[in-house]
Amino acid sequence: MNNPWELDHFREELVSVNIDAAQPQQLFLSVRGPPRTTPKQPVAIIECGAAATTRWWTVVQRLLCPTLRVYCYDRAGLGRSGHAVVFPRTASSMAFELERLFETVGVEPPFIFITHSYGAIITREFLARLPRPKQSVVGMLFVESNQEKTHQELIVSSHLSTSLSGLNSLVSTGLYEDHQYSEAEVEAILKYESGTTTNRSDKPSAAISELENMESSARALADREQLQKHILSPNPITVMRGDITRDLRRLFKTSGVMHQGAEEIESFLEHFARVDRQLQREILQLSHSARFVQAKKSGHHVEATEPELITAEVRRIVKLVR
């Protein structure tokens, strides 16, 4: 084994990936952690949520890398990657690009996936591309993850959605202060999440296309019946839930709508939390070796507020598969 992507303790660069399009896709990839000493040694891959970048996961990667090799990448048109070559940005197309990225750098399974929010839909489309998914993906951690029915059943009414428009979600949810990033890391998150990058004109369009195709991508995934088939069994998986209603409550409070209809808001949040909990628990069906963890101090971004909880759960999975 003489592949720097499997041996270097730290490496990051823009990788040119052949995606069978008019031009290659430039994808930013980073890796931290001890060298891979055998081909069967599991490595971790982090898949971010919709329109999000690897900057959110710097603390988790830093905590894990002393003992586990961890790869992070920015999807096309986001963060430090090049502009997106292929549109629309469906989960299926992004899973294909992920597959080609790791083929290009010569990093093969077994993988342990750490996936957040809509990233779970992309990762599960990646599973669908594998001829032997349970042999290739030996463990998964789903953090505040979407599933097939999320976009159908978790709905914010139009007049409540309108009340949230124009708010800075990082500030309004308290996440701007309640996190474990350094000052420089927070600045980097704000920079790349806002689209103020070198390729400014394209960054928002890729993000918007991801958001616009979330519901159709979830429907396409449902047709694969992965939950019913328990496609990762008996591999260990964990579903880790935060509390997105904590974020929503803070947003509503900042917008002033809590004062206008507190009873309606509380009823909505109670229903939202109940449905969200049930939807996330259904992901456990992917494997008979699955467990549910409730984060106690987090909203949607558990990686920002409780990275040590994620780290501990990944280490537990690693012990089970090694």
From Swiss-Prot:
Domain AB hydrolase-1 positions: 36-319
Molecular function via GO: hydrolase activity
Regions annotated as coiled coil: none
Name of the protein this chain belongs to: AB hydrolase superfamily protein FGSG_00044
Keyword terms of this UniProt record: Hydrolase
InterPro entries: AB_hydrolase_1 (IPR000073), AB_hydrolase_fold (IPR029058)
Membrane-spanning parts: none
The protein's annotated pathway: Mycotoxin biosynthesis
Role summary: AB hydrolase superfamily protein; part of the gene cluster that mediates the biosynthesis of gramillins A and B, bicyclic lipopeptides that induce cell death in maize leaves but not in wheat leaves. The nonribosomal peptide synthetase GRA1 incorporates respectively a glutamic adic (Glu), a leucine (Leu), a serine (Ser), a hydroxyglutamine (HOGln), a 2-amino decanoic acid, and 2 cysteins (CysB and CysA). The biosynthesis of 2-amino decanoic acid incorporated in gramillins could be initiated by a fatty acid synthase composed of the alpha and beta subunits FGSG_00036 and FGSG_11656.
Calcium among keywords: no
Keyword Hydrolase: yes
Similarity comment: Belongs to the AB hydrolase superfamily.
EC numbers for this chain: 3.-.-.-
